[in-house]
Amino acid sequence: TQDASTGQIINRKFINDLPLTSRSVFNLAELSPGVTQAPGGSFGLNAGATNFVSNGGRNSTADIVMDGVSQTNQENNSGITTALYTPPVDAVEEFKVQQNTYSADIGFGGNTVINVVTKSGTNQFHGSAYEFLQNSALNSNNWFNNQNGVKKSPSKQNQFGGTAGGPIRKNKMFFFGDYQGTIARSTGTARAGVPSAAERTGNFGELCGAAGGTFDSTGRCSAAAGQLWDPMTSTYSSSAGGAVRSGYIPYDNLSTYTSPGNPNLAGTPYVLPSGPGNLIDPVALKMMQYFPLPNVAVGTASYNPLNNWIGTNGSRSTDNRFDTKVDYRLSDASQITARFSESRSNSEGVNCFGNIADPCTQGPNNSHSYSASVNYTRVFTPTLVMNITYGYARSYSFTHGVATDFPSFNPVTTLGLPQYILTSGFVATPNITFGNGYQAVSS
């Protein structure tokens, strides 16, 4: 039968012959007119790496169908297309992108629909084996590295697997199976601004020079961006419509400065400790000790306190996935097909700080995906065909956090945080962000 649906079909020959660097069949979608990768999205093996747009449609309304079963997570609240399972390239018989004027059996998605049909066994035994190697010796450097004179980062990826298919009972029952494993290692660099030895004691005088200023005889920086102010000395200004800063900290040195506090606060004013350094929070002081010391241009004229550290980061990941499929011909007019697919992935970034405060990784991540389908087809007449499909797909991912690598860490006894911080169930260092002149700390 024929219908008026439009799109592009990519058969087994093209799937096998076209180069796919990532070995993801969903990269083939970009061969269709009007299909592009969505901003911030990518095509790949992992769930969530199939974010694309087509002919101006919203990427969150696309659908991915495998052997008649939807593989799309519609409830992830992220506004993207998420493939719950991605089959290996060697397991795909046909890949079709449907973009307009859909047939009657398409009604789940509101945009482009990708249809994937997996391979089946035949009366002859067939098999294949492969391995693809990528590493820093064979791969070329990217354009941005070449432009900035940066050498290639060490990397290595091994992707291997095989397929097998044939008859279980000739002319009656057939099987097909495949497996693919991926082991990837990559290394890069991370740059940041970290507290210097002086700043760990409360002396932030480096900030004035970094802002292009100098201190006068009273210790005030000539560059406003390099001057620290005492928040306790803020006063209300009707012309400004709020509090304005009024008391600067001489030489940006908190360790020698004594804040007078603010007696003008309504109610009971917050009482500061007496003596120099009374603005230094003991928890923040302890947290600063978890940062590595500066290692870039230290002691030279080019030293920049806002970009004074470089370290190694990277990632390690493994992925294993397989498909099994059985076709059984009940008669010349009817057939039943069953398929089961599974993938397991593990990844972990390199801890570039070497402790629990590391910003380069969120800790180990484990992902697990299942996909299954049972399909019954009955041909009544050349123009009347019945197809019944039952499917199941599930994917979940869990990030353990950096704290799993440091089981003995206790933020209450180590940093001096309040006891209730342990009741959330996640033990880690607080997250600190800055914006609009205010500081927010959350666990």
At which residue positions do the language-model features occur?
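Short acidic-glycine motifs
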Residues: 1-443
